[in-house]
């Protein structure tokens, strides 16, 4: 399926559905205003095992803080689940979500925001993996790859497949399901 057709026939209709459903489920208390700082957390936004080193004692050191700042803990929770490098099984997803629910239990609307936001983050990641189709970002990847065998067409096919998989996963999401 060509990218333009995918965006028009798959992504856009799904985006409209997800946006409407998520908006209707979003807690009224935070729908039209910024989340107060006391409900935010420091977040690297690219938090995951792909950005850490495991020491000989088993401890983990996180290295990549490019997008570090204050944010809704829902973003940290969702990005950890949706990031393509994570690839968590259902059991680990449940453990992560349960731990995050416990950690942010002082926020009475955290779980509602998480449930409403999870499909939105899936849609976001569907677009992020398509960055390979943007010439300037593809060139950055080519330069960072360092090998002379960088195959743009092959990379685009891989990323396109990931985007379609993200959309399928979002389609199968029950918006009223508690993710924790």
Regions found by a protein language model. Give the residues of each.
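Short, solvent-exposed segments of well-ordered alpha helices
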Residues: 38, 113-117, 150, 154
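ATP/Mg2+ or Mg2+-diphosphate-binding catalytic cores
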Residues: 2-5, 9, 127-180
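Catalytic activation segment of kinase domains across protein kinase-like and atypical kinase folds
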Residues: 50-80
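Short, charged/polar micro-motifs that form catalytic or ligand-binding hotspots
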Residues: 67, 86, 116
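Active-site activation/catalytic loop segments of kinase-like enzymes and analogous catalytic loops
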Residues: 73-108, 119-139
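Short beta-strand segments
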Residues: 42-45, 62-64, 127
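Short amphipathic alpha-helical segments and their helix-coil junctions
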Residues: 17, 25-28, 62, 94-113
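An alpha-helical support segment within catalytic cores of ATP-dependent transferases
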Residues: 1-45, 56, 110, 172-178
């Amino acid at each position: 399926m060509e990218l333009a057709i995918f965006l028009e026939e798959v992504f856009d209709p799904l985006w409209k559905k997800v946006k409407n459903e998520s908006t209707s489920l979003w807690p009224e208390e935070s729908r039209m205003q910024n989340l107060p700082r006391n409900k935010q957390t420091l977040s690297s936004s690219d938090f995951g095992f792909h950005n850490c080193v495991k020491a000989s004692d088993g401890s983990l050191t996180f290295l990549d803080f490019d997008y570090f700042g204050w944010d809704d803990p829902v973003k940290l929770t969702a990005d950890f689940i949706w990031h393509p490098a994570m690839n968590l099984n259902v059991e680990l997803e449940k453990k992560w979500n349960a731990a995050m629910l416990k950690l942010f239990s002082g926020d009475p609307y955290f779980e509602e925001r998480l449930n409403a936001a999870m499909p939105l983050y899936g849609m976001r990641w569907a677009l992020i993996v398509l960055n390979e189709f943007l010439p300037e970002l593809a060139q950055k990847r080519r330069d960072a790859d360092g090998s002379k065998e960088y195959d743009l067409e092959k990379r685009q096919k891989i990323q396109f497949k990931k985007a379609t998989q993200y959309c399928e996963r979002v389609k199968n999401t029950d918006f009223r399901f508690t993710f924790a």
